[in-house]
């Protein structure tokens, strides 16, 4: 593993550990660096800010892994994605509750919209309202996923995706 990834993983582990006891909004870059005995210079060499670190965690732990798989349907992809969130719900409950510029919610929305755009184009073709459909379903999925994960009695991922499928 290149040194760069070792450093990034150490910063990621520090952030995850801090988020077990502190809300994301109360964690500073200095806190993250202190937790893994690194300089702020090292942090900023690899990441723009703590939001960028969260997005990197999601990309390396989830998106990159899912890209390697061949899914028969979009539902299979959604099931794996939700299973990942369910298995890491402590971390993502805290990150999904933060909104705004550079937030994980914004990053996640962009990824979901990209995936749905491909599926929607297969369904609707070059319909002039394709962008509307993509936005609608992206927002619906994001709202449902956030509500599901933030529920203190979060149901298992398979049950959740089954209910989503029934809705559509």
PLM region descriptions:
Residues 128-151, 155-168:
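Hydrophobic alpha-helical segments that form the core
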Residues 4, 32-52, 84-87, 91-95, ...:
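Basic/polar phosphate-binding segments, predominantly the helix-turn-helix DNA-binding elements
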Residues 69, 92-95, 148, 152:
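Secondary-structure edge/capping motif, primarily at the C-terminal ends of alpha-helices
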Residues 75-90, 135, 139, 158:
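Amphipathic alpha-helical segments that line or abut small-molecule/effector binding pockets
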Residues 8-16, 25-29, 34-37, 44-71, ...:
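An amphipathic alpha-helix adjacent to DNA-recognition modules
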Residues 80, 100-124, 128-143:
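Amphipathic alpha-helical packing segments from all-alpha helical-bundle domains
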Residues 21-24, 151:
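Short helix-capping/hinge SLiMs at alpha-helix to coil transitions
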Residues 20-22, 128-129:
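Cytosolic nucleotide-binding catalytic cores of signal-transduction proteins
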């Amino acid at each position: 593993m290149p040194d760069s990834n070792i450093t990034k993983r150490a910063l990621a582990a520090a952030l995850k550990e801090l988020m077990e006891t502190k809300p994301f909004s109360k964690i500073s870059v200095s806190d993250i660096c202190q937790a893994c005995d690194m300089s702020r210079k090292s942090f900023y060499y690899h990441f723009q800010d703590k939001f960028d670190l969260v997005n990197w965690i999601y990309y390396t732990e989830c998106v990159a892994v899912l890209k390697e798989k061949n899914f028969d349907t979009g539902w299979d992809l959604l099931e794996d994605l939700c299973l990942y969130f369910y298995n890491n719900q402590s971390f993502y409950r805290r990150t999904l509750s933060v909104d705004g510029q550079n937030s994980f919610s914004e990053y996640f929305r962009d990824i979901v919209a990209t995936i749905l755009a491909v599926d929607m184009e297969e369904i609707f073709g070059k319909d002039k309202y394709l962008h509307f459909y993509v936005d609608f379903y992206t927002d619906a999925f994001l709202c449902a996923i956030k509500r599901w994960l933030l529920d203190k009695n979060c149901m298992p991922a398979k049950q959740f995706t089954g209910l989503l499928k029934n809705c559509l």
